[in-house]
Structure formats: C-alpha cells, structure tokens
C-alpha cells in the first residue's frame, strides 16, 4: 500500500473518530456502541453467511431508526470528502504528478511527434469549443449548506497536511475539524420540501461561485504554460476552450414548475450573480493597480488621472453596480435596463484588456500577468451571464400549440397532417412577413405557456441563451415548428434549435430526419454556426438496454457526421449523458476518446448531472483536474481520431446489439411480473414521494415506459442490482463466445476505444453490484410468488460477471485497479447497514401509513441519500 493510501485511511479514521465523539455527546455511550455493533455485524456478514446484521437492525427501536441512518450517511459523506481531497492533496517531491496534471503536456508532445506544427496546435487549442451543461438532478440529495461544510472540512484536511505545523497549530486544526463535523451532524441533511427550479439554479450558481470561478483561471494558466513549453506560443486572451451552460430554470420537459416566469427570473439571477462576482474581482484589482504609467490609449479614456488604472476600473465598477442594482429590481418589477447597465460581454472585457495591454507596453508585464489576467479569463469564459441557459421542451407541446392555432385560424388540425403537409405549411409561414397569430387570439393554458416561453427567449440577450432543445424529436417538422413559434414571438436573430433523439427508433431515424431537414430550401442558409444535434443516452438505454443503445448512439453519430459533411454543414453533437452507466455516464476522458472518428472535430457539448457536478466540480482542485481531462480528450479526439471500426467488428456489434435488446426486453417488457417485482423490490414508489427535485418522477400512469429514466435507474442502484446498466450484455457476450468469437472480442477490446470503454464501464458497474444485498431486499419486501424472478435476475448478474471476467482474463473484477476495489470494500462496511436498514424501513413504511415528516420517513430519506453518497452515482 502506498503512502497515499495510508494517508487516506488516516483521514477517514480521524473523521470517523470525530463523528463518533459528536454522536456520543448527543446520544450517549450505549447508542455509539450500537453503531459499532452494527458496523462489526456488517463486516462479519461479508465474511460469513450474512445473518447477523438483519437481526441486529430488526431489533432497533423506532426512535433509533433515524439517528442510526444518519450516522452511516454522515460517515459516507465524510469518506467521500476524504477521497475527493485525496485526489488533489499535495504530493511529495519524489512522487509523480497525477495523470490529470500531465495529460495535456504529454498529449502536446504526442501531437508534435505525429507531425502537427506549433502554429496548428496553438490555433486548434485556442478555438476549441467545449460546453459543459449543468443540469438539475432529482437525486442530488445533498443540501448546499452541508456541501459548504464538507468543503470546509477538505480545507482543514489540507491544513493538517502542512509539515511545519506547531503542536498548538495542529491542535487548532483538529478543533476546527471537530467543530465542522459537529455542525454537519446537527444540520438536517434532507430538505423537508421539494426544491423549486429557482432553488436548483441557485445551487448551480453556487458551484460556479465556490469552485469553477477559481478553477477556470488556474486551469487556463496551466494550459497556457503547457502550450508555451510545447510550441513557444501563448493562449490568446480571447480563447475560452471550456464554457458553461445550464438547464436549471430552462428545462421544462415534463416539469410544469418551469414556466416562462421562472426562466426570466433565472436569467436575471444569473446577471445579478455575474455582476456581483465581477465586482469582487474589480474591487481587489483596484486595490492592486495603483501604478501611474499608462499608454496613450488608456490615457485617452481617463485623461491625466494620477492613478489611470484605478480610474478605468472605477468606470467599470460603476457600471457593474448599476447592472447588479437593475437585475435586482427587475426581479420584482418589469423595467428596462438603463444606459449604464452592461449588456454586451465586450463592455466587460474591453476595459480589462485596455489595462492589460497598457501594463505590458509600459514594462509592467509581471503585474499584467497576475490577478488581472485571471479576471480577464473569467470575463471571457463566464461573461455577464455566467453561462448560457438552454430551453428544453417536448415536441408534443409544440405540436399541440400549432394544432390549436391552425384550428383557430380555420386551416385544419396541424396534428392530423402528414409530414409533407406540415413542412409545406411551416416553410410558407416562416417566409411570410405577416404574423400568424391575430392580436385577439386567446389560447388555452398549455399553448399560452409555450408562447410565453418563446417571448422570453426573444426578449433575452442573445449571449444569455444557448440552445432550444426539442425532446422526443422525430421529424424535420419538429425543428421548423419551434423556428416558427420563435419567429411569432418576435425573435429576429438566429437561435440554435436542436432535435434530441432519445429512443432506439429515434436514434436509428436521426440520419434520415437530418437529411430531410438539411435538404430543405433555405434551411442551411438560416444556420449561423454549426448544426447542433442532441443524442439521448437515458431513454434509449431504458428502452433497449445499454448494449443496443450504445451501438445505436454510435451509429447515429456516424450517420450525422456523414450527412453534415455531404451538406457542407459543421456538426456539433450534444451528449445527454447521466451520471450512471445506465444513463451513458462514466469517465469523460475515455468516453470522448471512444466517440466515432470525426464526431468531435474541435467541438463537444455534454450535460453534467447534479450529483456528478458535485463530485467532478465541487472543489476547485478537482474541477481543474476534470477540466484538464475534457480539454485534452477533445483535442486528442480532434487531431488524433480513432480509426473507423473494422467491418468484422461492426458485424459482431450488430449481433451483440440484436441479442442484447432481445434479452433485455424479454425481461423488462415481456415478463408480466416484472413491473410488479420492480415496484416491490426497490424504493421506486417511495422515491416519488421524496422531496428530491423540482421535477415529477413519473410522466403518466402506466408501466416502465411511464417512468422517467432517473427513478428507473435510481431504484435499481439503491438495491445494488444495478440492472439497467448490464441487463442484455450477459446474453449478448455469452452468445458471441458460443459462436467462437472470443478472439475477435479480445481484439475489439484491445484496438477499438468504443468497445473497450463499454466493457470497462460494464466491469465498473458489476464491481459495485451486489447480489447478496439485492437478495436481502427481496426477502424483506417481495411477495413469495415474485421471488423466483429476483433469483433469476441475480443469476443473470452472476453470468454477466463471469463473462466479463472471461473477456478480461482477470481473477476478479477491477483487478487492474486495486485502489478502486479497496475503496468499494471500505464503503461496503458503511453501505451494508444502510441497505439493510432501508429494506427494514421500506417494510415498516409499507405496512402502515406514515406521515412524510415522521421519523420513519425521514430515516428512509436519509438511507436514500447515504446510499447515493456511498455509491457516488445515483440516477
């Protein structure tokens, strides 16, 4: 075991000890002993037949349920914190830098060896367009208050690492840790009420304020340094290879709580927050830039001021204050922005650039390259709006709105027309100069809301908005329909209208739809920039299983690359990935490098889900590592794309997908007991009651199809069966081996990044799955006639593990990553009691009606949060 592992274990031990002290102070020695007994029972059950823990938990008194659940939940959160800090802790001089820190310098060296010139590398790096789209998440269960306390704990772990602390200073750090852990323990970890979409947006702003605001300039300094060392060239001031967007407050698909008024409020809050953050920067810069010497350009702006830089910054500060004040008052009353309000990012960037250039020209470059450069980088990356807000709505809502409009105008019912009739009507209206809607038209509520959203889009500054995403898009008319509704709302500038292809059938149809759209007269001429298309990972996996979904996503991207090239249109693919493998999640670096050749091309857009935002971007140091990985992967996929798959590999993949979807659907769709088994064996029904997000967990009444992808995955994750991530692979791979394709599969794993990444993700999820835990849920919750189905699914899980081990040639899953295995094992000691306790709580909850705020329901909520924290990927 390395020194690093030892230090991690020490941190976990210290945090656990301090938590124990806190619990003892509130609940006494006897209760703390109970926690220890449960922990030891969990360890014993891992080694033996597994009877001890269940009987210990079944004997718990009602009043002990909540504090026991809280104890194990808090421990897992502290263990997460220690592991996150471990990733960024200062290394000794003789230890190598982490992979994330070396990835860009190493890649630039490889690219030069491959024949790319210095100029070409610098140019490509400067024009990279990577957009990380932060999305709200029903399963992001940790409260902001607690996240801030955990961040402070990480800060104390860092302080504790300093070698030159005196005994008194070391004691001080220990006391601060003790106090923070006590604060966390005495803070309720679960919201009593559902967050609103505005609450979710504020959570996103907090991630920017506390982490990304600090990470971006530091990350870009290192990119600049790596580029300079490799090529002798600098990263231009206007370069922002990575920018941010958001769905929080803009994603109304299936969420009636996201209204036009909410979108307006979130856009204003973003402007207020941006002005406030930049004001803090400008105040700090004004204190520093006291120099007198300035170039003529700057002098022209401020005259003969004795402190010219401060004079420039004062002008900017006054405008930022005016912007912040206006945004604040506009939240409550609809008032136009005054002349002082900043509306264009250039108004923010220009004064900073002026100071930067002047300092360099006057021989004060060392000052220019300090905090002023950091502020400039932030201004270019975040701008006056922090990021762009996307709008998302279901295609059916636009269809219904147009049907009401055409019906009212006596033109017939839009919904009843075929695709050609719709396209003819939409194209004619898009060209028409007169409005489609008469002034006295009074639409129904749903149509009124769609039109109000379009008016908000038309009224907002262009730089504050990203894309208008159409979920469940299935035809070219779906895109034209949105363009027409936006035109009716008064939008005169081009806006990216983005079809989202989600189900297996839609992915297979994505090529023909885009072929039709790009072939329409005038459509391409209206594009400003690339054609954006979104690929959905969650619904396709729920519909067909991950084997068939992954291959359909790959083929759809290949087709889109080819079709856009034929039409001489640039393509931007937007990847709608979840945090889990069942929703397209996984390590971003590997995922980007496994995309089809030509599909990245300097541009990459992806969603970042709630709970993964915290793990990937919650601390500035970790955010920096993940930004490095994104940047390097997109640059590599652009300049060193993988070769296309060999025909033999494609044939194997076609067969794997066909076998996989059949095996998956035979269980999920064709077994009449499946839905009932799912509802009984997982906390799926209870998840709908929990205040876990602003969006309802169900679409409509019905079977699996009515479930949203998130609770579908979440339920299986809580019971550790992890079914959506692997079901179908066991049959597909077993059949391939039976056909004698073992050597071909090994070759694919070795030489084809797409296939290797799929198998690596499968191995990771199987290592976290646990048949013993899943069986414990069945024994406590499932009626006897459904238990054979549970046993069958666990057999399939075992088969999946065996076939993956056969493919990797390893004795155990993740044998190549002992540190990951060790951490899974460390977590299991604290996860096992939470799983068993959750099964016990579900049984008690289902046997009687409990109020939402009862200790029983609260304890159930805490187990959900704890298991999500322990597995670090929820839904």
UniProtKB/Swiss-Prot annotation:
GO terms for molecular function: magnesium ion binding; phosphoenolpyruvate carboxylase activity. It catalyses: oxaloacetate + phosphate = phosphoenolpyruvate + hydrogencarbonate. One of its GO terms (biological process) is tricarboxylic acid cycle. Its EC number is 4.1.1.31. The active site is at residues 137, 542. HAMAP family: PEPcase_type1. This is Phosphoenolpyruvate carboxylase. It comes from Pseudomonas putida (strain ATCC 47054 / DSM 6125 / CFBP 8728 / NCIMB 11950 / KT2440).
